[in-house]
Amino acid sequence: LTGGNGDYPNVRGTFTGLTLDDDQGALWRCVLEGIGYDYMEITDRYRKAGIDLTQLTITEGGSRDELWNQIKADMLDTKVVTLKVAGGAVPTNCIVAAYAAGDIPDLKQALQRQLEIKATYIPDENHTATYRKAYDKRETLLKALNGAL
């Protein structure tokens, strides 16, 4: 599954490789992996630019699902960390605003509570290798679909 990819503007979304044995769970996993392949493209570009991605901290709704977090760790070949307070930007902005208003005396202490680790996901080398091979096949498919549309 893919869509919204800048390199292939004509490709909107496809499910490929499905059989009659695949169920709704397989389709949901396709959705997650499709997003993950787009993440792979982005993180590959970051790494080529010299940005260190040995650990990613995931926040908001996407941090609440264990399977999704493990898929991200495997696909991106990086340690993924989730936080006990998954809210991300909104609660952090509220803390900064409360500090600015004088309601919180110690900004650093308040923010550190936001950074307590909930879970850590380590990439599985076998899964990472499988995703990398599939990613290369995906590139071939995207080029073909982009040219056909």
Language-model region placement:
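Glycine/Thr-rich phosphate-binding loops that ligate phosphate moieties of nucleotide
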Residues: 1-149
